[in-house]
UniProtKB/Swiss-Prot annotation:
Regulation: Regulated by PknD under osmotic stress.
Post-translational modification: Phosphorylated on Thr-2 by the serine/threonine-protein kinase PknD. Also phosphorylated to a lesser extent by PknB and PknE. Dephosphorylated by PstP.
Function description: Part of a signaling pathway that enables adaptation to osmotic stress through cell wall remodeling and virulence factor production. Unphosphorylated OprA forms a complex with the anti-anti-sigma-factor paralog Rv2638 that dissociates on OprA phosphorylation by PknD. Phosphorylation of OprA may stimulate the release of SigF from an inhibitory complex and enable the transcription of osmotically regulated genes, such as oprA and the ESX-1-associated virulence factor espA.
Name assigned to this protein: Osmosensory protein A
Amino acid sequence: MTTTIPTSKSACSVTTRPGNAAVDYGGAQIRAYLHHLATVVTIRGEIDAANVEQISEHVRRFSLGTNPMVLDLSELSHFSGAGISLLCILDEDCRAAGVQWALVASPAVVEQLGGRCDQGEHESMFPMARSVHKALHDLADAIDRRRQLVLPLISRSA
């Protein structure tokens, strides 16, 4: 089922399936779901100057909470230079809110970022992961490390 929803700047269409709706902004389909470790936002299709503002608005909603976020762009077929603003805004929002996030990039995204993503996850402009599975695994590891730091403090106070 597809429904067109008018917004203040443009119209988007929403395609629903049981339990998960995809929102379409001019060639980019956005789907989000809550995993127990993070909110995973997947964007397929194309991000360009014509739709990046609407996509940014939609994606920013998921960075305003306290849940970590994985932005999955692995299935993007086109990512213009205008899309970098989406990543910069998301990075700023997450840093300001203290929310951990990770980017899963397609070859089109890697190309726009100057190929820096394939040099390793620690040398890129943004927090990178090779897959959603790897991003969620890294988040689980980070939670375990924080727990290990806190456990000695708890046992001392008891």
